[in-house]
Amino acid sequence: MPPKGKRGICSEEKGRMSIMNKKVLGIAAAAAAAGGAVYAASKVKKQAQAQGMRREKESLQPRNYGDKQVYLVGGGLASMAAAAYLVRDANFDGHNIHILESMDVLGGSNDGAGSVQQGFVCRGGRMLNEETYENFWELFRSIPSLEQPQRSVTEEILNFDHAHPTCAHARLIDKDAKILDVRSMGFDNADRLAMTKLLLTPEERLDNMTIEDWFGPHFFETNFWYMWQTTFAFQKWSSLFEFRRYMNRMIFEFPRIETLEGVTRTPYNQYESVILPLKAYLETNGVRFETGRTVTDIDFAPGEALTATALHFADGSAVDLREGDVCIMTNACMTDSATLGNLHAPAPAPERKPVSAELWAKVAAKRPGLGNPEPFFGNVNESNWESFTVTCKGNRLLKMIENYSGNIPGSGALMTFKDSSWRMSIVVAAQPHFKAQDPDTTIFWGYGLYTDHVGDYVKKPMRDCTGAEILKELLHQLHWEEHQEEIMADVVNVIPCMMPYVDAQFQPRAMADRPPVVPQGSTNFAMVSQFVEIPEDMVFTEEYSVRAARIAVYTLFDIPKKICPVTPYNKAPKVLLNAARTMYR
């Protein structure tokens, strides 16, 4: 049964659709022709789902791995997913799988922590998508829910999401705190032409180009740009290559970008809803977690073949890889070097270098074909933004936001203050968002894209502001100055988080700067992260991490199963027609 609010447009929007100019059909036809063979997206999706149902019947012939070991460098979702595929699909002994994490907690960028006394914090929030997370949903159908062990994590998330549909009523807000009508994308003919031309241009021609290299000034003043930018954290200087990937991959969501109906939410933060169940599954199967273990270098055997032979650690120790051992490395992490502030202190300027990117640089310098981290991690002024998590006693502030926006907590997704100098947005999740929240504690999350800009009301750059100052800037954007004192009295904490490399994966680059998951000539080495190259897929997603993990394991272990393909919505005539109509709204 289709979830309420997850298909089509919001109920109050029905009936507004009108017959579009014949140009719409021309654009849709051109795009469909350029795509080559036309696929039925629904058919492909059904095939992927059927594959998931068959996987239990496709068990491998027993294999004798002996005492072979697998070392997974990095403890984020990609490494954990790789471990799950090793256990589930390669029948590999979990006791011989080692996840090596430099921090004292697993999950990588999927974090969530705190208490009712000290406040809660998430560095970021991951918006899942039912239509495009093919391998994510397939994997987590195998992972039992912690709260409902008879159900899978996939069932748990989708059931929750269908019961809490998203339909934003306050997507963009102007400097007068007026909620804007964003039904129209705001494109002019030059914008439409540029967008169509981009979608028809092979990505091989887009090396090192930025979004502002392609589009004119008007494009960056459209409703579409404000919404697309803040939904996915793009900047004008972001990679045109990645923008094009997003337009193709998320074209199904383009017609409903103003309501964010395609957003799929987890019951709690992703650490508790995704990472902890996966960790429990791996623990049950004997996987070894080694936290506080920083890999600083990897040795390779001489010769044309790429064979990892040793791992070196920050404490001076080393592990030799024997014949048959495997190393799968997280070659970079977007939340490396993140720092936290509090209500009375700004997040400190990051001093720690990105550990995972430093390791990647050492590895890449040893031979060609292993990528280049410099374009991603070489310009911190362009790759940073700052988030903040607000914890309050009682629900006074959340009720005010609900009454203002018309969205109950969990139903509205992003609210963006488009004229704010920080390009500030907030999200109010369904409560509780943390299992440790009590009924009298509420939280919400927000972020600003332009951390070097002086605030409109707090006359300091966002990066220099305390949590209290960031919240005061937000209250002024809403013109709630007269309520500031009573609101601040309810605040437990506002925790700013500066992430210097959180947009690194969107930095302009050449095609060769991201290495393949399994480099050419590899016998036992692979890389998984948001910084590997997976044709057709888009970075900055949970799906990218899981897909990379699946490619790595299936390739290195010769798994005779299919990986769920990227669903080609950009080749489905109906989807293209809806997208073309949206361009003329």
Give the label of every model feature segment.
Residues 21-70, 88-94, 578-585:
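Extreme N-terminal leader/targeting segments of oxidoreductases
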